[in-house]
Amino acid sequence: PHSFKLKGNKKLGGNKNLNYPFFAAKPFIRNRTLQIRNGGNDTRCRFKDPALQTIIQSSGIDIDGQSYQPVHEFINGKYIGVLNVREPNNKHYVYANYGWDEEEIDQFEMNPDSGYVQKCGTDEAFNTWYALSANAADEATYEEIKKLVDIDEYTNYMAMEFYLGGADWPQNNIKGFRRSVDGRFRFVTFDLDGAFGSNDPFNNFMGRQTYTFDPLYGCEVNRITAEIKLVTIFKNMLQNATFKKRVIDVYSLMGGSVFEPT
């Protein structure tokens, strides 16, 4: 079965919201769109991503992620199969979970075609974070960075990604957002189909400070080689002793608590 989206429509009443508690884990959120997903690149079991995200959410750790609900798909009465309903992972995720419209946020993503893409707002705060990170070892500078980034959620997110070892990250599958006025960046977990695809995720990440993005997959045409600033930022921030200790502690928490069988 194919993946598709459902979108709210003002013509059907309301304000584009789909007024129904689709997700038991988040009955309170205001969905304007839903993803009906077939498993993406996980073509065999189809639920690697929702299973991992459910484990993460159930642990109680502070990481933004998509809720999940399996559904049966019928088209004109014909049974198609089992798919999974997901929250969106873009500006509509921010609205559903935080109530901020796209005019109120800065949001970016990493795209395998072209690298960093600004989806909403401006890149001013992100570039300030990037510039400050060069001096992150200094505690005063680190405190300034903490005004731009939710350090706890960011560290949790990074440790989780390292633990799961996705093969298509960080050159892809990264989305960050913040409220434009005095907000702090948070990161949304999504598309963990490639989890466990890397046997050395930390060093693979560190080795992708420069990456060649491919607009036409498999064709040496219009390729873009660029810095992945998120790798540079993380490398720089590890120079801060406080941050480095937190990364080590949270990574240990991943294996010892979040993903520990109970």
Give the location of each predicted region.
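Catalytic-core segments of enzymes that bind and process phosphorylated/nucleotide-bearing substrates
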Residues: 1-262
